[in-house]
């Protein structure tokens, strides 16, 4: 029981099996027995990162380096964690240090390329990925990372080839499949993209969100006419509302539909789909549930019903507002003056380094906000005060804000 290396090796095995909480316990025990065990601190950090406990991962990687300053692997994994935390300049320094310690370390060159990409330094990113592949041509991770950089540059055809090469080298490389799905979808190859999107559940981030039911996931083939199907939300509120466009199709196929969604959406979706039993998401009893025959995460709806959507068109106006609230807001907006009334939102409430390229600054809206005879309404949920003041001072335009408007 006091053999630190045995606990460490057990942790490695458990981590490989995806049993991350148990791996965590084994690494922790190894460290308790041997506090200066740098590799145990390092793999503890890697496991914490997979569990998205980033601050703790950072501490473990830092401790591994303190114990073993020439530990190149710890430096580059510290860099990965720093990048996840949005600390890109520090991440760059960590990857650079790893390469200084071990110049032929292909993985570190590839990780450096990822950080360059996030910084918008695409030429440097491509050079780093090229170097990684030159050092280790069979490194699937490097081909996948190269592909993702090309994707961000809009070079979809080239990106697809790099992802395919990564998958050829490692057919079960879930991250490459998942990244390929986004490129296929961006390139308009919907069927291929939706098929590859199913690999999301094998990636570390999504694997943590999967639900452990006794009953099976629908395979898209089994008839639903005598089945109760549980659909469950898996991502954000906007995603749930988007995927709800498929509910009328599923409802027409199944005996009964239970939809579990974010609590805030229950009134809206109950009103919009009266034939669906809408409930707030509750994962606490997953293993014991017996109120359905089959289940499906909502992100898989398009995969199974895309042919029908393409043939008949997308559902339109499928969300039904509360008529009393419609009347209330119509009167309130009319009191501001003439319309049209345009609600605007220019950034996510979940701004991260990875999401920054998808959003705009309020300054980029100047042409739109300068259009005459339009009344603009703020739909930004937080951190908007300075932006609205800037618009008022620089453009002389008031974007109206209602403090009592539920912005989600």
Region annotations inferred by a language model:
Residues 1-408:
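Alpha-helical solenoid repeat scaffolds of the TPR/TPR-like class and their adjacent stem/linker regions
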């Amino acid at each position: 029981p006091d053999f630190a290396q045995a606990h460490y090796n057990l942790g490695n095995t458990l981590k490989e099996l995806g049993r991350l909480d148990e791996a965590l316990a084994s690494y922790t025990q190894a460290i308790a027995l041997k506090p200066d065990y740098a590799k145990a601190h390092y793999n503890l950090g890697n496991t914490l990162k997979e569990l998205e406990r980033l601050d703790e991962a950072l501490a473990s990687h830092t401790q591994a380096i303190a114990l073993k300053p020439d530990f190149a692997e710890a430096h580059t994994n510290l860099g990965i964690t720093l990048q996840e935390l949005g600390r890109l300049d520090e991440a760059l320094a960590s990857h650079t240090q790893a390469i200084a310690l071990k110049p032929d370390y292909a993985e570190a060159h590839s990780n450096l390329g990822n950080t360059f990409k996030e910084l918008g330094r695409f030429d440097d990113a491509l050079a780093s990925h090229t170097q990684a592949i030159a050092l280790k041509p069979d490194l699937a991770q490097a081909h996948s990372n190269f592909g993702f950089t090309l994707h961000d540059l809009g070079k979809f055809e080239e990106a697809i080839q790099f992802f395919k090469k990564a998958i050829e080298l490692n057919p079960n490389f879930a991250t490459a499949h998942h990244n390929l799905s986004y490129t296929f979808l961006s390139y308009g190859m919907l069927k291929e993209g939706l098929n590859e999107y199913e690999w999301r559940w094998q990636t570390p981030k999504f694997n943590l969100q999967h639900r452990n039911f006794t009953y099976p996931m629908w395979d898209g083939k089994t008839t639903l006419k005598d089945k109760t199907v549980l659909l469950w939300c898996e991502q954000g509120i906007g995603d749930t509302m988007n995927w709800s466009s498929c509910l009328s199709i599923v409802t027409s196929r199944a005996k009964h539909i239970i939809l579990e969604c974010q609590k805030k959406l229950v009134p809206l979706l109950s009103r919009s789909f009266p034939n669906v039993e809408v409930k707030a998401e509750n994962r606490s009893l997953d293993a014991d549930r017996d109120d359905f025959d089959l289940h499906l995460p909502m992100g898989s709806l398009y995969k199974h019903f895309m042919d029908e959507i393409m043939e008949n068109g997308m559902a339109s106006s499928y969300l039904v507002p509360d008529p009393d609230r419609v009347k209330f807001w119509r009167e309130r907006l009319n009191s501001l003056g003439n319309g049209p009334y345009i609600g605007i939102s220019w950034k996510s409430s979940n701004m991260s380094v990875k999401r920054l390229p998808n959003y705009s600054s309020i300054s980029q809206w100047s042409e739109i906000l300068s259009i005459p005879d339009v009344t603009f309404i703020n739909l930004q949920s937080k951190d908007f005060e300075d932006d609205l003041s800037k618009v008022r001072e620089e453009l002389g335009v008031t974007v109206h804000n209602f403090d009592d408007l539920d912005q989600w």
